[in-house]
């Protein structure tokens, strides 16, 4: 078995991202193996890490003066004057939010809801989420509701998956250097759902479960 050593050079937050710089001491590897190892790390970081995001959303409307509220569904192309911006843009705002789970999330799909009862602006902090789930940035304005005659409910899927749409990884760079080429420098940028160090550890566990020990 070939052995290598990993050193943490930098690990900090910058402009809404976590940044990490790591050095892999690969003296026992050939030059081709070092490049292959760098490609494997980059590919796994970008494609295989799991994350959560909002999926499809549904909006329901009811007249506020009804004694027993009856909500009927409207589609995303409906023009509701009381909602600004358009429903299409509202749903897009949901999909652009990042969700963090404080504990392992085992479900493939869960749901969130916003109850729109008064005329005001609604933010990501108004989303009702299952236990242990949080929106990373709670102050994103989703829409403005301009009516006192209606009530709305917006229900959104919370989906778990891997790949670019779900992964917390924003960018990965690496370079093989040294004389001879004995080191691999790896840069990782993540959003605020995970830091660079925890993302690298999760990647190593995916590549080889023995790293979990």
From Swiss-Prot:
Broad enzyme group: transferase
Nucleotidyltransferase in keyword set: yes
Enzymatic reactions: RNA(n) + a ribonucleoside 5'-triphosphate = RNA(n+1) + diphosphate
Chloroplast is among the record's keywords: yes
Subcellular location: Plastid, Chloroplast
Known EC number: 2.7.7.6
GO molecular function terms attached to this record: DNA-directed RNA polymerase activity; protein dimerization activity
Coiled coil stretches, renumbered: none
Main subcellular location of this protein, as a coarse class: plastid
Pfam families: RNA_pol_L
Keywords, ordered alphabetically: Chloroplast, DNA-directed RNA polymerase, Nucleotidyltransferase, Plastid, Transcription, Transferase
Record GO biological process: DNA-templated transcription
GO cellular component: chloroplast; DNA-directed RNA polymerase complex; mitochondrion
Task performed by this protein: DNA-dependent RNA polymerase catalyzes the transcription of DNA into RNA using the four ribonucleoside triphosphates as substrates.
Description of how the protein assembles with itself and partners: In plastids the minimal PEP RNA polymerase catalytic core is composed of four subunits: alpha, beta, beta', and beta''. When a (nuclear-encoded) sigma factor is associated with the core the holoenzyme is formed, which can initiate transcription.
Family stated for the protein in its record: Belongs to the RNA polymerase alpha chain family.
Protein name as it appears in the record: DNA-directed RNA polymerase subunit alpha
Organism: Euglena stellata
Source lineage: Eukaryota, Discoba, Euglenozoa, Euglenida, Spirocuta
